[in-house]
Curated annotation (Swiss-Prot):
Heterodimer. The active follitropin is a heterodimer composed of an alpha chain/CGA shared with other hormones and a unique beta chain/FSHB shown here. This is Follitropin subunit beta. Glycans are attached at residues 25, 42. The keyword Metal-binding does not apply. Belongs to the glycoprotein hormones subunit beta family. The gene is FSHB.
Amino acid sequence: MKTLQFFFLFCCWKAICCNSCELTNITIAIEKEECRFCISINTTWCAGHCYTRDLVYKDPARPNIQKTCTFKELVYETVRVPGCAHHADSLYTYPVATQCHCGKCDSDSTDCTVRGLGPSYCSFGEMKE
């Protein structure tokens, strides 16, 4: 019984005190206006949860910053979209996260909305393999 209680307390401590914001492999749809279709590529991005809280009483002197799992460092990779017209620019550059942390969402470089379009959204409706 004590082992079960210890395990339960350990799980609660892990959920509250330890962030699990880490790199994860994802598949995203990339599209070029000139090519009129999308392709899927594999990349890494940040996923997980971060300890945060929403205060009941708002204090204007202390801003309430919600922490989210976001990138700390990025690199950019470029891929050639196959099957584009010869006159079209078929190069596409996309971000690859190399390090993650729990921090404030930077709306200048990230979609901080509650529910974005998602990584597999394709505005053309046609995916090529």
